[in-house]
């Protein structure tokens, strides 16, 4: 029996899972994914921290990606699981704001960080002689700090606006977390100006970085094609193809969701697409970056004593 005990200031999250055995099975699957994502990203952060061979700009950026993914999935899954198991779909006004802030911060910051990682690979492969100068430790810190700062500022602006618009009597958000576009459907005022700002924000933090990433990857692939060293060509292609896989899996559903007009969106489709960038991507990223990377596998063998059958 579902209990919807809530005050007039609370929101209701209608959720993702049906209240039956299928929902229980899917929840168990999501909890397993959450566990794998937590272990995988925590292990990646630990490896990069303790292994001196991974103390390079590329892996420093990768450790930040793992941290963002860890916070990303922790923002949505625990609350979704608690609501499903307890039957209480409510979330407080403040809790909704906090969840929305962290979700948007991770979303924007990760998009900018992926752009920084693509730029790092572009410099390493296309301008290897100047790489130590252009990609210094200070530059790496600035890129990471800029990603977090810009993501937080953008998130704060969206969250403050979403919490200050007047809402109608119904406060049932047809989503499994406090997604701002889903919250706007409950507004009692015209939100076309804000929807336009969402479009602009999505373009600045997702679409334009995606175009920049694909452009730099194209330059890298062109340079890789003209490499004389077969081993170097293989290593460079593996690195860039791995990053492209992560980028496409993250950006495609995000851009498709947030750049569509309201009349072309459906809550059911938005929730399914959100599963990709809030649940699946944080689990897949450490797997993709580790299984195709000999240096990471070697670090696992040295630090954790696993994969000892693999040669570095």
Swiss-Prot record:
A Gene Ontology biological process term: detection of chemical stimulus involved in sensory perception of smell
Cytoplasmic side: 49-56, 120-138, 219-235, 292-312
PROSITE patterns found in the cross-reference section: G_PROTEIN_RECEP_F1_1, G_PROTEIN_RECEP_F1_2
Alphabetic keyword roster: Cell membrane, Disulfide bond, G-protein coupled receptor, Glycoprotein, Membrane, Olfaction, Receptor, Sensory transduction, Transducer, Transmembrane, Transmembrane helix
Extracellular topological domain residue ranges: 1-24, 79-99, 158-194, 259-271
Disulfide cross-links: 96-188
Sites carrying sugar chains: 5, 20
Transmembrane annotation, as ranges: 25-48, 57-78, 100-119, 139-157, 195-218, 236-258, 272-291
Name of the gene this protein is made from: OR2L13
Organism per entry: Homo sapiens
Protein name stated in the entry: Olfactory receptor 2L13
Matches recorded under InterPro entries: GPCR_Rhodpsn (IPR000276), GPCR_Rhodpsn_7TM (IPR017452), Olfact_rcpt (IPR000725)
Keyword Disulfide bond among UniProt keywords: yes
UniProt subcellular location: Cell membrane
């Amino acid at each position: 029996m579902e209990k919807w005990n809530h005050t007039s200031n609370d929101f209701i999250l209608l959720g993702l899972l049906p209240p039956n055995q299928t929902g229980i099975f899917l929840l168990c699957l999501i909890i397993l994914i959450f566990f794998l994502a937590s272990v995988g990203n925590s292990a990646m952060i630990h490896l990069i921290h303790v292994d001196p061979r991974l103390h390079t700009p590329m892996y420093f950026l990768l450790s930040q990606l793992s941290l963002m993914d860890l916070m990303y999935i922790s923002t949505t899954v625990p609350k979704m699981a608690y609501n499903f198991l307890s039957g209480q779909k409510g979330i407080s006004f403040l809790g909704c704001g906090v969840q929305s802030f962290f979700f948007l911060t991770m979303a924007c910051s990760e998009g900018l960080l992926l752009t920084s990682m693509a730029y790092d690979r572009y410099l390493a492969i296309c301008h290897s002689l100047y790489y130590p100068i252009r990609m210094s430790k200070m530059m790496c810190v600035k890129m990471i700090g800029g990603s977090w700062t810009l993501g937080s500022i953008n998130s704060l602006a969206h969250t403050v606006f979403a919490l200050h618009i007047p809402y109608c009597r119904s406060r049932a958000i047809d989503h499994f977390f406090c997604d701002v576009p889903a919250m706007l459907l409950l507004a009692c005022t015209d939100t076309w100006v804000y929807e336009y700002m969402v479009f602009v924000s999505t373009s600045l933090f997702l679409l334009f970085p995606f175009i920049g990433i694909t452009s730099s990857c194209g330059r890298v692939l062109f340079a890789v094609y003209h490499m004389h060293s077969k081993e170097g060509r293989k290593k460079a292609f593996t690195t860039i193809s791995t990053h492209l896989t992560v980028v496409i899996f993250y950006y495609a559903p995000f851009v498709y969701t947030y750049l569509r007009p309201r009349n072309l969106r459906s809550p059911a489709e938005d929730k399914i697409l959100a599963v990709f960038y809030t649940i699946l991507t944080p689990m897949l990223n450490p797997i993709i970056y580790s299984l195709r990377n000999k240096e990471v596998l070697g670090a696992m063998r040295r630090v954790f004593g696993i994969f000892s059958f693999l040669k570095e």
